Amino acid sequence: MCIRDRDIESLVIPHGSAWGNTSPPMATWSNQLNGKEHDPKFQNLIEIFSGHGNSEEYRSWEAFNEVEGGLECPSPTDNYLPDCFQAGEIIRERCRVSAGDENLCNIRAEEARNNFTNANPYGLLSIPNNRPSEWLNSGQCQDCYLPAFEYRPRSSVQYALALRNFEDKNSEPFRFGFIGSSDNHSSRPGTGYKEIDRIRNTDSKYKSSNAFMSLGQSQQSFAIPRSQEINLEQMIDRMKPSQGERVASFLYTGGLIASHVSQKNRESLWNSLNTREVYATSGERILLWFDVLNHPSGIKPMGSEFSMSKNPVFQVRALGSQKQIPGCSSDNQLDASTLNRLCNGECFNPVDERNIIQRIEIIRIRPQTYPNEPIETLIEDPWKIIECEPSQEGCLVEFEDPNFLNANREVIYYVRAIQAPSLAVGAANLACEFDDSGKCIEVNLCGDIEGQGEGDCLSDNEERAWSSPVFIKPTLN
């Protein structure tokens, strides 16, 4: 309100929206999609990726089921293990180890699930002396790209784009362009140029050899085989329990925002932000264009919003990031001691060779047209996949939506340009070990000597760029 009243040129950019370390389990964009909470004049961009992970993808599972009178603990799905359910499994295993009979252990497991659910958002406290490894991969999006920790799907970017408010006549839909950022809290932006130095270039500081960082986790001998009820009235002044050891496996070197401008000055950059002619990357300097070719007034770039009386024809151009070599360029004007202080002697140091773009993924979202229209049926991810020929010249593809006019509804399109696999910090997340049925049976935490180690926790990753969407409504002849 202060910004609006003073007529200050401003942008309000939500960030880390699906990050569950700070958002409660049932967080949803529907709480903000109203005339009071959302003003598209200021809020037309969103951070889709950062050092705290990816907030892009929607999934239909939830941490709890909403039922009349409260919440209940859902069962696991193929790609999601609820924390509340795992709370029961922790107590069941502790009960088994302490020689409890099967019936007693089942009763205590059910009790633990209920205690965890009733203690929301302090459920972790219902399991006495819980250890990070006991939670396995619970609470995580297991099939998302570099996901945010404790993923909140109804706070994802895709959910926001598909959502509509049919009750508030003053509400405008979310029409977000996409940005990326580092968000590493160290005043060192753009740290994704090389996948090195986890402690310096990410928020992941955990080392199990450091007694302070390990928070004195209890040993198995103190694993009490029964959960406890939590009095929420006593939690009013208490912060939500920290999961620093697990969070460390979901922190990355961060993303970038890229802008399409004809001049490198503040005015041009500011204009591109306001017109959404920007895109996000996972940290690599990937070049990306996404245009509609056949609009009557000419080419419409990413971020555009318009109507059409014909099926849209799209073009995507993508060029991989430049490959990096160790160290800093000999042309650098800074002395060695300064370079070591600023970036540990590792600069953006490209060679004249680029990483290969492997494929283009197209995502199609059809926003809701009536109240409670199921969101999961409206997000097609991916709608199309187009493979690219390996080339130093990048990738150029065109495609059409032949069903746009027949659908007779607004459609949102955006693309991802995917690079060939390369190593990245934290890309394996919890590095689960699976049994024959595909169930996670052991985790290897980043920063843990007995897990992925205290180094950079490197694993294969497909770096990418996300275009801002185009928003198209049909105009019937």
Give the location of each predicted region.
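C-terminal functional module detector
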Residues: 5-11, 16-477
